[in-house]
Amino acid sequence: MAKEITKIIKLQINAGAANPSPPVGPALGQAGVNIMAFCKEFNAATQKQAGDLLPTVITVYKDKSFSFITKQPPGSVLLKKAAGVASGSGEPNKKKVATLSKAKLMEVVNTKLPDLNTKDPERAARILAGQARQMGIEVEGM
């Protein structure tokens, strides 16, 4: 028989840097999970992606055990990294902060594709190009 799920927690945690301080500690403490056990498991599983912000879905079971799934970094983080900018534009329709080539966009698409709601790379490129436009990053050829 499958374990009974009591809570699902969604957090964004830096890879390899989970610690008991907020937001991880309070969220897991309320669910009754051993915080240090989660931190050790998470850090071990994500040490190769150190520094990336990872959306994480933590499933807490009735016996206070847990499992977690990490996803790819948010599209905005990947786009900023590909464009080489620290942040998006405050006025994206007036002030552009960077230009991104279609080849660079396709690299981001290949990274992010498993987490998007499409399996078609061309449609995924359109999704991420729209997100880039909203951040003030111009995409060549789109």
Swiss-Prot record:
Under the subunit heading, UniProt states: Part of the ribosomal stalk of the 50S ribosomal subunit. Interacts with L10 and the large rRNA to form the base of the stalk. L10 forms an elongated spine to which L12 dimers bind in a sequential fashion forming a multimeric L10(L12)X complex.
Gene field:
rplK
Biological role: Forms part of the ribosomal stalk which helps the ribosome interact with GTP-bound translation factors.
Q: Which family does it belong to?
A: Belongs to the universal ribosomal protein uL11 family.
The record describes its post-translational modification as: One or more lysine residues are methylated.
Question: What are the record's GO terms for cellular component?
Answer: cytosolic large ribosomal subunit
Q: Which domain of life is it from?
A: Bacteria
UniProt xrefs under SUPFAM superfamilies: Ribosomal L11/L12e N-terminal domain, Ribosomal protein L11, C-terminal domain
Instruction: Indicate what this protein is called per its UniProt record.
Output: Large ribosomal subunit protein uL11
